[in-house]
Each structure stands twice: as C-alpha cells, then as structure tokens.
A protein has these predicted regions:
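NAD(P)-binding Rossmann-fold cofactor-contacting core
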Residues: 23-26, 32-53
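Rossmann-fold NAD(P)-binding glycine/threonine-rich loop
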Residues: 101-129, 133
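Mobile, glycine- and charge-enriched loop segments
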Residues: 31, 55, 60-78, 115, ...
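Short N-terminal or domain-adjacent regulatory/targeting segments
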Residues: 1-11
Length: 134
C-alpha cells in the first residue's frame, strides 16, 4: 500500500532545492545528485551562486525565478527561514513543500496546507525515496 510520501515522490518530476550547495560534502549536494540520477529535473536555488551551475543545472536566486512548474520545493535552510520560503512556494503554486531532516515549521505547515499544498517536514527525500526501491 502506498503512503502519501511514496505517492508524492512517484508522481513528481521537478524539484527545486532551496539551499543547494556546490560542496560535494554537503547533504544538499548529495541529495540533489541522487535525485537527479533518479530522473528528477532539479532546480538548485542559492542566491550566492545564482546564474552559475551545480551538477550541470543553472542555479536560481529565488523560487519565482524558475520558469518551469515545480512539483516539490525541497528545503535545506534553517527552520526560521521556512515561512518566507513557504510564501514563495504558494506564489509558485507548487504541489509539495518538503523540509529536510531537523527542519520543522508548524507555521509553514498551516499556511501551505490552507492553500492545498502537501507538507512534509523532518524527512530526507533521498532516504524516503530509497525506502521505495526495496
């Protein structure tokens, strides 16, 4: 039986990585590389590297700068930055706001779910994806 996370990962194709890093030792880089290898179209977001490339993908300054539709916004930023990211996700009309391990934002959960956006927190997309490959 599929759960919500499995369904989200199975039906999504585009993922914006907020807090993307070009440092191969950072979790955001490792997760981004894994997801890209699994066939997802990745959109790295990091205002320090905008207009450069990470893993061959153009880096964007903000979610709104991406011209494509985004299925998942995957957040690698501190919890206190999530509300602003959630508001960008709502404006972009994304399907899911996903907060990585140790990132929690009850306020963001309330505002995105009130807009019909899926909300996942304190879970790693790579770890969750690997669970469904068994």
């Amino acid at each position: 039986m599929k759960n919500e996370i499995h369904t989200i990962l199975e039906t999504s194709r585009t993922i914006a990585i907020v807090g993307a890093s070009k440092n191969e030792n950072k979790d955001s880089y490792k997760v981004m590389k894994y997801l890209q290898h699994k066939g997802y179209k990745i959109f790295p977001i990091n205002h320090n590297f905008s207009d450069r490339k990470i893993l061959g993908e153009t880096v964007y300054d903000k979610i709104e700068d991406i011209q494509n539709d985004i299925d998942i916004v995957n957040v690698f930023r501190p919890s206190d930055e999530v509300i602003a990211i959630a508001k960008q996700a709502i404006e972009k009309k994304v399907k899911t706001l996903w907060l990585q391990l140790d990132i929690i934002s009850p306020e963001s959960k309330l505002i995105v779910e009130s807009e019909g956006i899926n909300f996942i927190e304190n879970k790693c997309t790579k770890i969750e994806h690997e669970k469904f490959l068994r």
